[in-house]
Swiss-Prot record:
Described purpose of this protein according to its UniProt entry: Catalyzes the ferrous insertion into protoporphyrin IX.
Protein name (database record): Ferrochelatase
Entry binding sites for Fe cation: 214, 295
UniProt keyword annotation of Lyase present: yes
The gene coding this protein: hemH
Highest taxon listed in the record's lineage: Bacteria
Family listed: Belongs to the ferrochelatase family.
InterPro entries: Ferrochelatase (IPR001015), Ferrochelatase_C (IPR033644), Ferrochelatase_N (IPR033659)
Organism: Allorhizobium ampelinum (strain ATCC BAA-846 / DSM 112012 / S4)
CDD domains on file: Ferrochelatase_C (cd00419), Ferrochelatase_N (cd03411)
Length: 344
């Protein structure tokens, strides 16, 4: 490298090169729980055509006339209940940053690899971190959307945004995207370990465990989105790894939004029905979420637990996401090392 630099003309701008970037990307987070921060975040999120596939002529009047005037306050209150007050940020941001920092440490045997992190919506943006990696000398970037199961509304929109960032670059790094890893044995083992460890910490045994995945509209599935199948495959492999009968572990879908039908069974309706049918003890895990966030901490640990208890259930426990735990990092590192093959 020094020989190449020595042959550059004196007036040549400084050029960094020879590095490989790894960019971890999660969904996103507001900068704060106030109305303005929430509205800015929701506007970016809900304006994405991958998330809401309705006609803009139909959707924008609803978004700007109703949703962005009513939802920021409600969602802000929900975020405030699970906010990381010590760092004044969402736990999703905390965990994603921790994952990137720990990943960098675990890859010290690859000195030319630079690890960074970004959010699809909010800050730090994908473009800002890709620009930073390129300026740091990364001629190749491994883009890692932190979603074990592929969906157009999650993985694809991260890829879209990354390729959009390339449009602004004169010297474009080579870009490689990480595929889904819903059936990765290391991932399945980590989920099984987390379930077994959590249940061992309880003084009661759940009658069944729900694996609650984020839902998508049924219409997206009918158009060819593989997400539904990959969620069920993860659930099946996890149940087999645990050695449980079919009735012990159930796949459900949460977080539906709007009037159309989403993937079923719905998590909230399921926990209510289970309680009314006489089930007294359940636990819920969120295999599709790499990190705990609003949808796991508030919607499941909070709301779903309340629904279960109000309907007659007695014991409810939420199993934390893998986050930046040793098992969680082992999963991410395994994927990164595999996808970096041929580059480092």
């Amino acid at each position: 490298m020094s020989a190449i630099v020595n042959h550059l003309p004196s007036e040549h701008p400084k050029v960094n090169f020879g590095k490989v970037g790894v960019l971890l990307v999660n969904l996103g987070t507001p900068d704060g729980t106030d109305y303005t921060s929430m509205r800015r975040y929701l506007r970016e999120f809900l304006s994405d055509k991958r998330v809401i596939e309705w006609s803009r002529l139909f959707w924008y009047p609803i978004l700007y006339g109703i949703v962005l005037n009513t939802r920021p306050g409600k969602v802000g209150k929900a975020y405030a209940e699970i906010w990381n007050n010590d760092l004044n940020e969402s736990y999703l941001r905390t965990y994603t940053r921790n994952q990137a920092e720990k990943m960098a440490v675990s890859l010290t045997d690859m000195p030319n690899v630079v690890v960074d992190w970004a959010m699809r919506y909010g800050q730090p943006s994908i473009k800002s971190r890709m620009d930073a990696l390129q300026k740091a000398g990364c001629e190749k970037i491994l883009l890692f959307p932190l979603y074990p199961q592929y969906a157009a509304a999650t993985t694809a929109t991260v890829n879209d945004e990354a390729f959009k960032a390339l449009l602004k670059m004169r010297w474009q790094p080579a870009l490689r995207t990480v595929p889904q890893y819903s059936d990765d044995p290391v991932y399945i083992d980590a989920l099984a370990n987390s379930i077994e460890a959590h249940l061992a910490s309880l003084d009661w045994e759940p009658e069944l465990v729900l694996t609650s995945f984020h839902g998508i509209p049924k219409s997206y599935f009918m158009k060819g989105d593989p997400y539904h199948c990959q969620c069920y495959k993860t659930g099946r492999l996890l149940r087999e790894r645990l050695g449980w009968p079919k009735e012990k572990l159930m796949v459900t879908f949460q977080s539906r939004f709007g009037p159309e039908e989403w993937l079923q069974p719905y998590t909230d309706k399921t926990v209510e029905k289970l309680a009314k049918d006489g089930v007294k003890r359940i636990a819920v895990i969120n295999p599709g979420f790499v990190s705990d966030c609003l949808e796991t901490l508030e919607e499941i640990a909070g709301e779903a637990g309340e629904i279960f208890h109000h309907a007659g259930g007695e014991k409810f426990s939420h199993i934390p996401c893998l986050n930046d735990s040793p098992d969680g990092m082992r999963v991410l590192e395994n994927v990164v090392r595999r996808e970096l093959q041929g580059w480092v």
